[in-house]
A protein has these predicted regions:
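Short, surface-exposed amphipathic charged segments that create phosphate/polyanion-binding patches used
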Residues: 105-109, 243-251, 371-372, 421-433
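Short, compositionally biased "basic patch" segments
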Residues: 146-161, 248-255, 326-352
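Hard-cation-handling environments
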Residues: 183-330, 342-343, 393, 400-404, ...
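Charged, amphipathic alpha-helical linkers/stalks
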Residues: 415-475
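His/Asp/Glu-rich metal-coordinating catalytic cores
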Residues: 1-10, 15, 19, 26-208, ...
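C-terminal, active-site-flanking charged/polar segments
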Residues: 315, 390-434
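Generic long, charged, amphipathic alpha-helical segments
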Residues: 343-374
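A polyampholytic, Gly/Pro-enriched intrinsically disordered region
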Residues: 55-60, 248-261, 343, 426-451
C-alpha cells in the first residue's frame, strides 16, 4: 500500500521500534491522522525528533567520509523536518474513549501497562451486514511495574493480534526486590568511594530508576550516605521525565497517585541533578564525591554514557549497573559477558569496575503473562494471530495458545492475509530471511573477513596517499608490506 493511500495510523506506543518509521511514511506521502493516546503523542513529539537528529548526524558523518573518498552522498532515512511534519499529524485520544474513524470503523485505546501511554487497541469493523471486532494487543506490559498501571484486560474479540516478545520464556517465579538489590549496589560502591554508572534507556527505564532512588532516600535506606547525588545526563531522558510529570492522571498507578495526592512527585528528590549541555556533562567526572550517573544509551552504543564509561570503567571502586536488555554485539553485552578491556574513542580502557545487572526489570509480559492477558477475554477469540517476536518464538507461542485455549492460532509472515468475514487464512505470507539466521560461527567468520578486506582497502588508500614519497621512505614502506604479505601467504 502506498503511504499516500493510507488514511489512518493507529499507534500503540512511542517506542521507536513501533513509531520510528512514521516520519519516513510522511516523507513518502502519508498525510492522514495518527491516532494514539495523549501520553504517546507527547513522547513521540520528543522521540521522533531525537531519532531524526540521529539520522541527520549519521548522514553528516558518513558524507564527510564519502566526500573524501569520492563516494556518492548518503541521504538520511528522514530529517527533523519530516519528524516535525509527522508530529503535526498526531491526533490524541483518551483511554477508554470509543471514537468513529470513518463509516464502518470504530476504535478504542486501553492501557496495556508497557510504557507511559501504551495501549491495546479495539477495532470494530462493519462492511455491509457483517461486523467483526479485532483487538491488537500492542506490547503487553509486565505486572507490578513502578509508576504505570498493570495491563487492562479486554472482554471480547472475534480476532486477536498479539505480540510474543517473551512468548517462549518466563521472568522467574520470585518477585524481585528491586529497591533492596539496588540499595546493596549503592552501599557497596559508595563505601569504596566509587560512582554507580547506569546505562539506561531514556524513556521508561530512567524514570523507573528515579522512582526507586526516591524510595531509597525517602525511607532512609542508606543512612550512611543520606545526601548522595544523582545525575541524569541525557537531554532526552530529562524531556521524557517532564512528559511523565505532565501525564499523571490516567497513566500513573494507585501507588504513584497516592504520592501525587500527598504532594509528592514520585520522580523528584533531594540531590537530583540534570545536565543539558555537553559542558555540564563533562563537569560530572571532575566531581570526586561518590554519586549515581544515569545516562543513555541503554546498550552503550552511543550517547554520553560512553564518556562516563571511559572515566569510570578503569576504576575498581566504581560499579557499572545494567538495568535493561543488552543485545548481542553491543558494548553493554560485551561488558556483562566479562570483557577485560573495551575500546572507547580510540582508546583501550581496562575494565576494573564491578559489573552488576539489576535482574528482573522488564517492561514486557512473559509467556505466562501473555497467556493470563488472553484469559481475560470472557470468550476466547475465534482466531489468534501471533506477531512481534522471533520466528521460532511466534511459532512456539501460537502452538501454546492453541494447546491452552483450543482456538486456532498462527504466526503470519510478512504479507500474510486473513479474510475476517469468513475467518479464513488467504496467505500465510513470506518469510523475510535475516542474516542472523546464519550460524554464529559463519557470521563471525564473515564479519572478521570483511574487516580484513576493509583493512586491506585502507592500506591501498595509504599507498596512494604516499605517492611522491622520498625513494628511501618508499622502499622502506614497500619492504614492510612485502614482509607482511610473505608472513600470511601460506
Amino acid at each position: 500500500v502506498a503511504p499516500g493511500d493510507v488514511d489512518y495510523i493507529l499507534l500503540t506506543h512511542a517506542h521507536i521500534d513501533h513509531s520510528g518509521n512514521i516520519p519516513l511514511l510522511v516523507k513518502k506521502g502519508f498525510s492522514g491522522e495518527i491516532i494514539t493516546t495523549f501520553a504517546t503523542a507527547d513522547l513521540c513529539d520528543i522521540m521522533l525528533r531525537d531519532s531524526a537528529h540521529i539520522q541527520e548526524f549519521e548522514a553528516e558523518w558518513r558524507n564527510r567520509k564519502a566526500r573524501r573518498s569520492g563516494e556518492p552522498e548518503y541521504e538520511p532515512i528522514y530529517t527533523v523536518a519530516d519528524a516535525d511534519a509527522a508530529t503535526k499529524l498526531l491526533a490524541p485520544v483518551d483511554y477508554g474513549q470509543k471514537i468513529t474513524l470513518c463509516d464502518g470503523i470504530e476504535v478504542r485505546f486501553n492501557d496495556v501497562g508497557h510504557l507511559l501511554g501504551s495501549a491495546s487497541i479495539e477495532v470494530w469493523i462493519t462492511e455491509g451486514d457483517v461486523s467483526k471486532k479485532v483487538v491488537f494487543s500492542g506490547d503487553v506490559g509486565n505486572v507490578n511495574q513502578p509508576i504505570i498501571k498493570d495491563p487492562q484486560l479486554v472482554k471480547e474479540a472475534d480476532y486477536l493480534v498479539i505480540e510474543s516478545t517473551y512468548g517462549d520464556r518466563t521472568h522467574g517465579e520470585d518477585i524481585p526486590d528491586y529497591v533492596g538489590e539496588f540499595t546493596r549496589i549503592l552501599r557497596e560502591t559508595f563505601q569504596k568511594g566509587g560512582n554507580v554508572v547506569i546505562p539506561s534507556f531514556a524513556v521508561g527505564r530512567t524514570q523507573e530508576i528515579l522512582y526507586f532512588i526516591r524510595e531509597i532516600k525517602e525511607k532512609n535506606l542508606l543512612p550512611e550516605f543520606p545526601g548522595f547525588e544523582v545525575y541524569v545526563d541525557s537531554p532526552l531522558a530529562i524531556e521524557a521525565t517532564n512528559v511523565f510529570n505532565k501525564n499523571v492522571k490516567g497513566c500513573f498507578d494507585e501507588e504513584a497517585m497516592e504520592l501525587v495526592n500527598q504532594g509528592i512527585n514520585p520522580l523528584l528528590f533531594r540531590g537530583l541533578k540534570t545536565t543539558i549541555t555537553s559542558d555540564e556533562s563533562r563537569q560530572i567526572n571532575f566531581d570526586t564525591k561518590p554519586k549515581v550517573i544515569l545516562s543513555a544509551s541503554g546498550m552503550c552504543e552511543a550517547g554520553r554514557i560512553r564518556h562516563h564509561l571511559k572515566h569510570n570503567l578503569w576504576r575498581p571502586e566504581c560499579t557499572i549497573c545494567f538495568v535493561g536488555y543488552q543485545a548481542v554485539g553491543t558494548l553493554g553485552r560485551k561488558l556483562i559477558e566479562g570483557a577485560e578491556s573495551v575500546k572507547l574513542f580510540g582508546e583501550n580502557i581496562t575494565v576494573n569496575a564491578r559489573i552488576e545487572v539489576l535482574k528482573g526489570i522488564s517492561g514486557h509480559a512473559d509467556m505466562n503473562g501473555l497467556l493470563d492477558w488472553i484469559r481475560g477475554f470472557e470468550k476466547i477469540p475465534d482466531r489468534v494471530m501471533v506477531v512481534h517476536g522471533e520466528d521460532t518464538v511466534t511459532d512456539h507461542f501460537a502452538k501454546l495458545v492453541e494447546d491452552t485455549f483450543g482456538c486456532p492460532a498462527f504466526a503470519p509472515y510478512s504479507g500474510g492475509t486473513v479474510d475476517l468475514a469468513a475467518n479464513e487464512i488467504i496467505t500465510i505470507g513470506q518469510k523475510i530471511p535475516k542474516k542472523s539466521d546464519e550460524k554464529p560461527s559463519k557470521l563471525k567468520s564473515a564479519s572478521a573477513f570483511n574487516r580484513l578486506v576493509a583493512a586491506a582497502k585502507r592500506l591501498l588508500n595509504v599507498v596512494y596517499k604516499n605517492e611522491g614519497l622520498a625513494n628511501k621512505d618508499m622502499a622502506k614502506f614497500e619492504t614492510q608490506i612485502q614482509n607482511l604479505a610473505d608472513k600470511w601467504d601460506r
